[in-house]
From Swiss-Prot:
Identification of the protein by name: Diablo IAP-binding mitochondrial protein
Record organism: Homo sapiens (Human)
Protein family (similarity comment): Belongs to the Smac/DIABLO protein family.
Encoding gene per record: DIABLO
Subunit structure: Homodimer. Interacts with BIRC2/c-IAP1 (via BIR3 domain). Interacts with BIRC6/BRUCE; inhibits BIRC6 activity. Interacts with BIRC7/livin. Interacts with XIAP/BIRC4 (via BIR3 domain). Interacts with the monomeric and dimeric form of BIRC5/survivin. Interacts with AREL1 (via HECT domain); in the cytoplasm following induction of apoptosis. Interacts with BEX3.
Domain notes: The mature N-terminus mediates interaction with XIAP/BIRC4.
Coiled coil: none
Transit peptide residue numbers: 1-21
Disorder named in the UniProt entry: Deafness, autosomal dominant, 64: A form of non-syndromic sensorineural hearing loss. Sensorineural deafness results from damage to the neural receptors of the inner ear, the nerve pathways to the brain, or the area of the brain that receives sound information.
Key words of the record: Apoptosis, Cytoplasm, Deafness, Disease variant, Mitochondrion, Non-syndromic deafness, Transit peptide, Ubl conjugation
Source domain of life: Eukaryota
Amino acid sequence: MAALKSWLSRSVTSFFRYRQCLCVPVVANFKKRCFSELIRPWHKTVTIGFGVTLCAVPIAQKSEPHSLSSEALMRRAVSLVTDSTSTFLSQTTYALIEAITEYTKAVYTLTSLYRQYTSLLGKMNSEEEDEVWQVIIGARAEMTSKHQEYLKLETTWMTAVGLSEMAAEAAYQTGADQASITARNHIQLVKLQVEEVHQLSRKAETKLAEAQIEELRQKTQEEGEERAESEQEAYLRED
């Protein structure tokens, strides 16, 4: 009987040990799988959150006391001003040069018409002369329009020059020497360019004045000859 109890006890103990050996790996695997399922999204969350955190945190910059001083900020600001005024001056200079060039062309066109008209004096009838004069009047109106346009642009250009000169002076006063020198050199350059086209326009105006004087002289001479012929004919008729 004692032997039977001992055998049963050993059998029960072995059975439970066997079940424990079977269940422990299963439970362990289950717990491990569940832990893995739980930890996987947490890893993603931590990774994403960490990345966002890195993006959100500003990178500290080295302090530059010299670049943040009032004098440096003023020099930087005045450099921007000189750049802006120089750009404005360049654009107005280009527009003015183009306008003066167009005016000069119109002057030369009118000069050519006057010379042609002068060469045809005494060779045209009244109708042909009227037609030529209509062309001359149209060319003169075109020249006047171009002249007014360039005078208007010249006023704007002079304003741009004044702004650039003030910006250059401000740059000099604040210690932005390079910006001041650059602005003043630019002003001198555009003034030289405008003066060159002005000389061409003045030369054209001189040519026009000469053509008009010649036309007037020829016309006066022709009228004098016609008057002399008329007087001569009248004198002969009286005889």
